[in-house]
Amino acid sequence: MKAIDKMTDNPPQEGLSGRKIIYDEDGKPCRSCNTLLDFQYVTGKISNGLKNLSSNGKLAGTGALTGEASELMPGSRTYRKVDPPDVEQLGRSSWTLLHSVAASYPAQPTDQQKGEMKQFLNIFSHIYPCNWCAKDFEKYIRENAPQVESREELGRWMCEAHNKVNKKLRKPKFDCNFWEKRWKDGWDE
């Protein structure tokens, strides 16, 4: 299968996962905006004949396409060859970082800390590797200013921002009453 580039007349609009393929400004598939499976499909690393995916996103009978390679990097005893993160891995990791930052934010921040948090979130929305995700978060920040007066306000604001994304992705809403247990204190059990 030939790799897709910007010269292709009709690049795929949907990947093997069923998600819409996101292309960057140059018309090339965005690596961090698509799942690994879809990116490999549109770049020709796997073929359209791979429709027999199991429910966990792996090809039936193989461990392929999970993003985890069993080979070690050349000259390494510990580092494995792993592909760059896809949109799902990037999203999970980013939300983990953002929620953890909110959970460690002071209960009573100084004016400097408030300014730094606003600046961090603003910069984050500009540099996020998935361009359409970045624009969406930037828009959310414009329409819903980050609440940085306290840890409680920031944690709830972050939870609400995450739930907005979850809704777009048709994922269940997280009960923001539990944000501290999930991201700061842990569960009582």
Swiss-Prot record:
Any single GO CC term annotated in Swiss-Prot or TrEMBL for this entry: mitochondrion
Keyword Disulfide bond in annotation: yes
Catalytic activity: 2 R'C(R)SH + O2 = R'C(R)S-S(R)CR' + H2O2
Impact when changing residue 130 to S: Loss of function
GO BP: any one term: mitochondrial disulfide relay system
GO molecular function: flavin adenine dinucleotide binding; flavin-dependent sulfhydryl oxidase activity; thiol oxidase activity
Family annotation (InterPro entries): ALR/ERV, ERV/ALR_sulphydryl_oxid_sf, ERV/ALR_sulphydryl_oxidase
Location within or outside the cell: Mitochondrion intermembrane space
Function of the protein: FAD-dependent sulfhydryl oxidase that catalyzes disulfide bond formation. Required for the import and folding of small cysteine-containing proteins in the mitochondrial intermembrane space (IMS). Forms a redox cycle with MIA40 that involves a disulfide relay system. Important for maintaining the cysteine residues in MIA40 in an oxidized state. Reduced ERV1 is reoxidized by cytochrome c. Required for the maturation of cytoplasmic, but not of mitochondrial Fe/S proteins.
Name used for this protein in its record: Mitochondrial FAD-linked sulfhydryl oxidase ERV1
Species this protein is from: Saccharomyces cerevisiae (strain ATCC 204508 / S288c)
Lineage: Eukaryota, Fungi, Dikarya, Ascomycota, Saccharomycotina
